[in-house]
């Protein structure tokens, strides 16, 4: 679902920021 993708995307965003 879009909700799940949002959370996954957030996690990737933080990882990429690192």
Curated annotation (Swiss-Prot):
It comes from the Eukaryota. Keywords: Olfaction, Sensory transduction, Transport. GO terms for biological process: sensory perception of smell. Antenna. Belongs to the PBP/GOBP family. Homodimer. Present in the aqueous fluid surrounding olfactory sensory dendrites and are thought to aid in the capture and transport of hydrophobic odorants into and through this fluid. This is General odorant-binding protein. It comes from Hyalophora cecropia (Cecropia moth).
